[in-house]
């Protein structure tokens, strides 16, 4: 255990200790600037439970945690399966990926090369109701009457943000799942096809079971991204208005609300209280996914 002492000490210092400090400060009235503060017990937690904006941000964060992994992982599995197994049969091979699959993987992965801030800015320009690319295309096909204010409409803003997050992350999972599928022996697919199975059947009976551990890890990772920095960056750049968090707080999420309370309003103690709630939500999400996704490990 001696060689683990230094890494464990660093982990405790830079990961565990900040969490402990945050929990401690959540019981105080610290502003974040003054060295003096007093203990107020569960005052911040009582305030949080009565805070309508907190509940709205929690609702949006939970929506992100459920919808984004479902859509992103689902699309990534479909694209990866098509790239590796979905092509037409060729001479000497019972199964094959689509032609040019290596090129498509590069195309799908390209958004990962861009900073999430750049991606958010690009889509902010595209969503512009007056000069954006999306409304310009709608005008070009004769839909002049359909010109939504994408980020200014409370009913559309959250969906627009989620589209950006899916677009920016799906390529990473396509490459991840493609690597996993490439390690599955082709004999399994050939035997299944000889027995009369189609590609739909082989996906659910061969690919998905053998790739399950990777899918589960990807689901948890995407959920953590949706609850953390990725959602904060996109919402902060694309939709923050005078009140913060889009029109009528329609896109406010927990990480952004923590930031606003800590750095805009000078309420660091209350911000750490919301941060504790975010920590509990993240841990609960990971625990639920691991519990629901638990199954016997398949070897090949």
How would you describe each model-predicted region?
Residues 3-300:
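A structural signal for multi-pass alpha-helical bundles of membrane permease subunits
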């Amino acid at each position: 255990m001696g060689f683990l002492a230094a890494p464990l000490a660093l982990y405790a210092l830079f990961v565990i200790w900040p969490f402990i400090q945050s929990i401690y400060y959540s019981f105080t009235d610290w502003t974040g600037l003054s060295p003096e503060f007093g203990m107020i017990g569960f005052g911040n937690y009582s305030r949080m439970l009565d805070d309508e904006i907190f509940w709205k941000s929690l609702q949006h964060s939970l929506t992100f945690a459920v919808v984004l992994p479902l859509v992103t992982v689902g699309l990534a599995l479909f694209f990866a399966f098509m790239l590796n197994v979905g092509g037409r049969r060729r001479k000497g091979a019972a199964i094959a990926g689509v032609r040019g699959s290596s090129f498509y993987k590069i195309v799908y992965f390209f958004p990962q090369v861009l900073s999430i801030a750049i991606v958010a800015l690009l889509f902010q320009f595209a969503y512009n109701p007056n000069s954006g690319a999306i409304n310009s295309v709608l005008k070009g096909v004769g839909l002049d009457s359909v010109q939504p204010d994408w980020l200014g409409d409370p009913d559309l803003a959250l969906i627009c943000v989620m589209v950006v997050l899916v677009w920016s992350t799906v390529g990473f999972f396509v490459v991840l799942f493609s690597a996993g599928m490439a390690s599955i022996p082709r004999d399994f697919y050939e035997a299944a096809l000889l027995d009369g199975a189609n590609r739909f059947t082989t996906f659910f009976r061969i690919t998905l079971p053998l790739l399950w551990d990777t899918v589960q890890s990807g689901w948890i990772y995407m959920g953590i991204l949706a609850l953390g920095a990725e959602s904060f960056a996109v919402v902060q750049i694309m939709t923050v208005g005078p009140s913060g968090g889009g029109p009528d707080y329609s896109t406010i999420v927990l990480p952004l609300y923590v930031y606003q309370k800590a750095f805009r309003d000078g309420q660091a103690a209350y911000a750490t209280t919301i941060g504790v709630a975010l920590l509990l939500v993240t841990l609960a999400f990971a625990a639920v996914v691991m519990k629901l996704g638990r199954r016997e490990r398949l070897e090949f």
